[in-house]
UniProtKB/Swiss-Prot annotation:
Key words, A-Z: Disulfide bond, Growth factor, Heparin-binding, Mitogen, Secreted, Signal
Gene designation per UniProt: PTN
Top-level taxonomy: Eukaryota, Metazoa, Chordata, Craniata, Vertebrata
Protein name (record): Pleiotrophin
GO terms for cellular component: endoplasmic reticulum; extracellular region; extracellular space; plasma membrane; protein-containing complex; Schaffer collateral - CA1 synapse
Tissues and organs where the protein is expressed, per its UniProt entry: Osteoblast and brain.
PANTHER family documented for this protein: PLEIOTROPHIN, PLEIOTROPHIN FAMILY MEMBER
MF-aspect GO terms: carbohydrate binding; chondroitin sulfate binding; growth factor activity; heparin binding; integrin binding; molecular function activator activity; protein kinase binding; protein phosphatase inhibitor activity
GO biological process terms, semicolon-separated: bone mineralization; cell surface receptor protein tyrosine phosphatase signaling pathway; decidualization; dendrite arborization; dendrite regeneration; estrous cycle; integrin-mediated signaling pathway; learning
Organism (species): Homo sapiens (Human)
Disulfide bond entries: C47-C76, C55-C85, C62-C89, C99-C131, C109-C141
Induction: By heparin and retinoic acid.
Subunit structure as annotated in this protein's UniProt entry: Interacts with ALK and NEK6. Interacts with PTPRZ1 (via chondroitin sulfate groups); promotes formation of homooligomers; oligomerization impairs tyrosine phosphatase activity. Forms a complex with PTPRZ1 and CTNNB1; this complex inactivates PTPRZ1 protein tyrosine phosphatase activity through PTN interaction and stimulates tyrosine phosphorylation of CTNNB1. Interacts with ITGB3 and ITGA5. Forms a complex with PTPRZ1 and integrin alpha-V/beta-3 (ITGAV:ITGB3) that stimulates endothelial cell migration through ITGB3 'Tyr-773' phosphorylation.
């Protein structure tokens, strides 16, 4: 009886050992198969940097729009693509829709030119846009207006009528 148990244990051990060897061989084959595959990826250094055009609004002169990008490279799969963009509507468009400036307060009115000016320094440039470091803008001086006498006289008339009603 002991001999039979011994034979069964040997068979179980041999089966487990063979299963272990089989698993090791399968894992080794899978790893070897991965190493043999040639690299299909194109190196990033073969493609040039993306160069983006200015943002072109879909409608009007601000809001949502698109820009086109191009890059060079013989092995590049994609050399052109379109990207969605947005031009803020509160930016000064005369200096470029992609350049944001921080402006100082308006200066005093120049009586010779009837203009007042202020300067702005570059705060931010979107998508590597080429922007001037400082810009100057001018606008006509506002007319110096005196308080309207009509407005004051209307107030006085109303107050006078109120006093008359109170006296009655």
């Amino acid at each position: 009886m002991q001999a039979q148990q011994y034979q069964q244990q040997r068979r179980k051990f041999a089966a487990a050992f063979l299963a272990f060897i089989f698993i090791l061989a399968a894992v080794d084959t899978a790893e070897a198969g991965k190493k043999e595959k040639p690299e299909k990826k194109v190196k990033k250094s073969d493609c040039g940097e993306w160069q983006w055009s200015v943002c072109v609004p879909t409608s009007g002169d601000c809001g949502l729009g698109t820009r086109e990008g191009t890059r060079t490279g013989a092995e590049c799969k994609q050399t052109m693509k379109t990207q969605r963009c947005k031009i803020p509507c509160n930016w000064k468009k005369q200096f470029g829709a992609e350049c944001k400036y921080q402006f100082q307060a308006w200066g005093e009115c120049d009586l010779n030119t009837a203009l007042k000016t202020r300067t702005g320094s570059l705060k931010r440039a979107l998508h590597n846009a080429e922007c001037q470091k400082t810009v100057t803008i001018s606008k006509p001086c506002g007319k110096l207006t005196k308080p309207k006498p009509q407005a004051e006289s209307k107030k006085k008339k109303k107050e006078g009528k109120k006093q008359e009603k109170m006296l009655d």
